[in-house]
């Protein structure tokens, strides 16, 4: 039986021309107060653009309820959600059983669909509506998991650019929350019946930052400086994040941002806790989707060895809902070995950093349970009290490769990528 669901008949997807191109590259930066970190005016971030736009500003901003937010990460998550939503909708309307794609790493992502009985006989307008709703939900889920996968890869040493490792910033304290926020805002923008994706997203980013209590430009640097020697050490090429945020929502389906206490203008505001995307809502339509990742990076051997016996896992796939928990436990154990027991606790000093003032608790308590990522939690903001009620314990360089049901072609830099890198090196931000 096919029933229910949000009416998304008027949803505004990317245009076919936009969807031909991969989401463009954007330069991210550390949240730390180090050389190279860009701080845009959070009240004038410019218009979001799926394609190249010299008036779009990115960098680190600080919010009272969301802590540091990387606008580049947020925008990338938005664009990947929109890109995947367009292609997944096309696959569903073509009755394809499988769909595959690549993000910004060699890994290949697979989706396997099971359709409900009677799907082929539904009126075209009903199929369109259901396909649109499912595509948006699945795209947000896959984008979020793909972004987490990128953090996992960089933790194990993956380099998107030769000789430049992203390990120092893997699971830095703002990464996951920024990605999650982007997925959420993309869902809302895609469902906007009156504006195209770029226009709707421009408005939603500004509105959400205001709701999170975004602070003037200097506050982002000041908040980073406040945790120098506690959450990070060093500077520029020698910066190391000694506090890592491994909260991907595996324990309870929610992600809590790290808040820097005492930041001017915030008055000890409580963190805005968000639910991670899930696939649970597909059941109301009678659909099911299996999502897998096939690692193709050099680092795959070590990652797969966590899940499979030696010599047996080199061609295996990873199912995030089933395997990310074990991988994250392994990553956390490595982090504890390298940085100390409290590596993921922002309230206590790191033993490998200078012993400065201790950052006080700010609602970032941690608790180990089966992941609701598998069982599902709907997109939505929850209060601290609501989250406590659900807690039961603690705890994405390339192109899109065509395959069965796949989209895109080749591993290459797009014109948008070249323009983005050139503009950055010419000086995007003052």
Question: Where do the language-model regions lie?
Answer:
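Divalent metal-coordination and catalytic microenvironments
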Residues: 151, 175, 181
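Long, low-complexity repeat tracts used as extracellular stalks/passenger repeats
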Residues: 358-429
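Bulky hydrophobic segments
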Residues: 2-168, 187-362, 367-369, 379, ...
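A glycine-rich, coil/turn loop motif that links secondary-structure elements
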Residues: 168-174
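A subset of signal/propeptide-processing and intrinsically disordered low-complexity segments
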Residues: 2, 146, 170, 390-393, ...
